[in-house]
């Protein structure tokens, strides 16, 4: 029985073999996500399959948090993983460290990330869009030198508005060198002083149109000072260049329509304006003719002197009023001049008063300073005298340990005034002391 292995022992041995194999520690796998689940813990559980096989897989929260897209059922992905055995079930599975979308999916991922970035910078804001001129003199067309796009644009402009000069700028629209060529041609067209630029090409896959999703191309369109019409691909195709351009056309033909007016519509408008103007002129002339006929029947035209008699009288009246007005204006200005002269004299008087006030204020300030100086001197002198008095005060003397000796209300200043058995009163700093003389000693004894 010792030769038989338990299921768990065999599973552990197989897991050991997997974990020790260096070729299984970092494996690159391509496949489709299925049975995708995101656990509440943040771990991802899913299968990776192709047409023939399915592998169980998981991705820990730490690795999943670094993903720059949201995985979902059916995504074609590229994985970097470690192969091991899940002992509980006894089946092998992969532990994914890195995941990215495969092929077109990865392109769409890059497209969305760049679109978000440029949107946040304001490159697609409607407020920055320039209007397309209604009657362009020159139109620059940036597209491939051959193909349906240039033919459609050229024929449409010629049929709609042949007055517009077309400047064809042959441009690479596909391939590795196309990006730099598109940018160079946009900057060149912008320097020509044209009215409108059409940037276009025919339809294709996302890979074919990818140059018009390149950040540098989008920024070149956004920074262009000349209005740009984007006509990249078919109606269902969208590129970031469409969002950066001043207007997006579904097709190259529509771009030519947007860029030009229709000559036949313009001709109809001109004919309509001509008809309206002619009708207006005829009506106005008829009204003026009737007005002249009416005036010619007026009685004053039959007696011409009546036309200017009143005007002569009115002229004389105006002349009189003008003279009166001149005289009144003269008197008004003379009166104003007198007032100004009086005001000037008053101003001079006020100026003199102000000067005296300034002088008085200056003298007052000087007097205040002098008084303050004297007061300060008196204060300092008084302070010194108070200090001297305090020094001579008996109270201050007693504070230093001395006492005042009284005998029958007389102050004793000499031992000669004392005899034995005299009753004395000693005044000290904090009270009185009664004392009796027991012996008298003089300094010369």
Swiss-Prot record:
GO terms for biological process: DNA catabolic process. GO terms for cellular component: cytoplasm; exodeoxyribonuclease VII complex. It is found in: Cytoplasm. It comes from the Bacteria. Its main location: cytoplasm. It catalyses: Exonucleolytic cleavage in either 5'- to 3'- or 3'- to 5'-direction to yield nucleoside 5'-phosphates. One of its GO terms (molecular function) is nucleic acid binding. Keywords: Cytoplasm, Exonuclease, Hydrolase, Nuclease. Belongs to the XseA family. NCBIfam families: xseA (TIGR00237). Heterooligomer composed of large and small subunits. Bidirectionally degrades single-stranded DNA into large acid-insoluble oligonucleotides, which are then degraded further into small acid-soluble oligonucleotides. PANTHER family: EXODEOXYRIBONUCLEASE 7 LARGE SUBUNIT (PTHR30008:SF0). This is Exodeoxyribonuclease 7 large subunit. It comes from Staphylococcus aureus (strain bovine RF122 / ET3-1).
């Amino acid at each position: 029985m010792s030769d038989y292995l338990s299921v768990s022992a065999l599973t552990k041995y197989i897991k050991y073999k997997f974990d020790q194999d260096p070729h299984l520690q970092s494996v690159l796998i391509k496949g489709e996500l299925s049975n995708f689940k995101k656990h509440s813990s943040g771990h991802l559980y899913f299968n990776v399959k192709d047409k023939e096989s399915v592998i169980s897989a998981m991705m820990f929260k730490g690795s999943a948090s670094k993903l720059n897209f949201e995985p979902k059922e059916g995504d074609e992905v590229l994985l970097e993983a470690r192969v091991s055995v899940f002992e509980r079930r006894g089946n092998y599975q992969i532990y994914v460290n890195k995941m990215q979308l495969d092929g077109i999916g990865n392109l769409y991922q890059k497209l969305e990330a760049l679109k978000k970035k440029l949107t946040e910078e304001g490159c697609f804001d409607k407020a920055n869009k320039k209007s397309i001129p209604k009657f362009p003199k020159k139109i620059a067309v940036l597209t491939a030198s051959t193909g349906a796009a240039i033919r459609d644009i050229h024929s449409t402009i010629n049929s709609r508005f042949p007055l517009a000069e077309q400047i064809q700028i042959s441009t690479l629209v596909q391939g590795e060198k196309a990006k730099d060529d598109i940018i160079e041609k946009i900057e060149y067209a912008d320097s020509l002083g044209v009215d409108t630029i059409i940037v276009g090409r025919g339809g294709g896959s996302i890979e074919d149109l990818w140059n018009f999703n390149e950040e540098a191309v989008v920024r070149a369109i956004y920074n262009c000072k000349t209005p740009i019409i984007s006509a990249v691909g078919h109606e269902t195709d969208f590129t970031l260049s469409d969002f950066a351009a001043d207007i997006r056309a579904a097709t190259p033909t529509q771009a030519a329509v947007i860029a030009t007016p229709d000559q036949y519509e313009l001709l109809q408008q001109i004919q309509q304006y001509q008809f309206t103007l002619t009708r207006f002129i005829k009506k106005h002339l008829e009204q003026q003719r009737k007005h002249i006929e009416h005036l010619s029947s007026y009685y004053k035209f039959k007696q011409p002197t009546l036309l200017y008699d009143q005007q002569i009288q009115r002229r004389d009246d105006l002349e009189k009023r003008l003279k009166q007005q001149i005289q009144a204006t003269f008197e008004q200005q003379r009166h104003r001049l007198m007032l100004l002269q009086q005001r000037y004299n008053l101003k001079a008087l006020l100026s003199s008063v102000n000067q005296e006030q300034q002088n008085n204020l200056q003298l007052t300030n000087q007097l205040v300073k002098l008084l303050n100086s004297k007061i300060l001197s008196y204060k300092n002198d008084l302070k010194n005298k108070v200090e001297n008095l305090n020094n001579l005060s008996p109270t201050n003397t007693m504070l230093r340990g001395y006492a005042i000796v009284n005998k029958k209300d007389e102050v004793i200043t000499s031992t000669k005034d004392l005899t034995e058995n005299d009753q004395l009163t000693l005044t000290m700093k904090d009270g009185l002391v009664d004392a009796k003389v027991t012996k008298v000693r003089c300094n010369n004894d």
